[in-house]
């Protein structure tokens, strides 16, 4: 299900109509995804974003400024297997995306599973969303127009969790989360090399903990263990992503930008 219109603007000097940049964000209705959608809208882009829930998508759209709504293109889409990816690519391959932001994930995988079978499935699901999905989207979207790819990863793709932060024996940060994010960081480097001749820059961002889904006790403990003494705020998420999609980072590809308040420095 898709809503939206093509967005254009007119250069006053030449009166030439130029199509605005189109951005594709997977996972656009989560804590981080919503900040990215709003940020790109503020930069006057047309934003396509995926969500697995029409209810969440509709709720999010109600919170967006009225003047931006027509520049939003919500796509209700599950990514559970290769067929889902292939159907999505077939449908949107001709869209002239300038930027791809790979941010999709399944929050339910955060909970450590009880049985080996459940654990096995969660491991596969996490790897699928962090590696397979970004890879197949990156190599199959229209490279004639694609200029930037940014993979959203985590500080736990750089360092393992600190056991002193968790009172539930890592249940809130299962091993497959960090492993999949580490793989996504390396995928970014591989794609940066392989897509360089097409003038497509590929980078990743490892964010630290972001306020919004944790209790006060966790925030206080996290603050004691982080050099900046706090978690990231949702409003701090967009600008680093924008930096990697702008001419200010024109010489950067294959880089993993760490925004974690200094967590990984010790």
Where do the PLM segments sit?
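Short C-terminal tail/terminal secondary-structure segment
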Residues: 253-266
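Short, small/polar-rich loop/turn modules that mediate ligand/substrate recognition or access, typified
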Residues: 196, 201, 252-254
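Catalytic loop of short-chain dehydrogenase/reductase
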Residues: 150-197
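Conserved glycine-rich Rossmann-like NAD(P)H-binding loop of the short-chain dehydrogenase/reductase
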Residues: 43-59
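Conserved mid-core segment of classical short-chain dehydrogenase/reductases
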Residues: 105-122, 160-169, 214-217
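A conserved structural motif in NAD(P)-dependent oxidoreductases
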Residues: 226-237, 248
């Amino acid at each position: 299900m898709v809503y939206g219109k093509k967005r254009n603007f007119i250069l006053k000097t030449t009166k030439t109509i130029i199509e605005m940049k189109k951005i594709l964000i997977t996972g656009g209705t989560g804590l981080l995804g919503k900040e990215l959608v709003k940020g790109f809208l503020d930069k006057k882009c047309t934003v396509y974003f995926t969500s697995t829930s029409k209810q969440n998508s509709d709720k999010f759209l109600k919170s967006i400024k009225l003047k931006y709504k027509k520049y939003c293109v919500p796509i209700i889409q599950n990514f559970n297997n290769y067929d889902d990816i292939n159907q999505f690519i077939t449908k949107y391959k001709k869209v002239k995306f300038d930027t791809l932001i790979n941010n999709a994930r399944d929050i339910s995988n955060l909970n450590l599973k009880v049985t080996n079978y459940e654990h096995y499935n969660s491991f596969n699901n996490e790897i699928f969303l962090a590696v397979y999905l970004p890879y197949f989207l990156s190599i199959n979207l229209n490279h004639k127009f694609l200029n930037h790819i940014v993979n959203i990863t985590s500080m736990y793709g750089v360092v393992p969790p600190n056991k002193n932060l968790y009172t539930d024996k890592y249940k809130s940060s299962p091993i497959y989360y960090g492993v999949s994010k580490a793989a996504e960081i390396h995928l970014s480097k591989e794609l940066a090399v392989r897509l360089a001749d097409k003038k497509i820059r590929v980078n990743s961002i490892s964010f630290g903990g972001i306020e919004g889904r944790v209790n006060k006790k966790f925030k206080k403990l996290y603050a004691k263990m982080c050099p900046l003494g706090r978690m990231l705020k949702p409003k701090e998420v967009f600008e680093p992503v924008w930096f990697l999609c702008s001419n200010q980072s024109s010489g950067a590809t294959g880089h993993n930008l760490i925004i974690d308040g200094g967590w990984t420095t010790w």
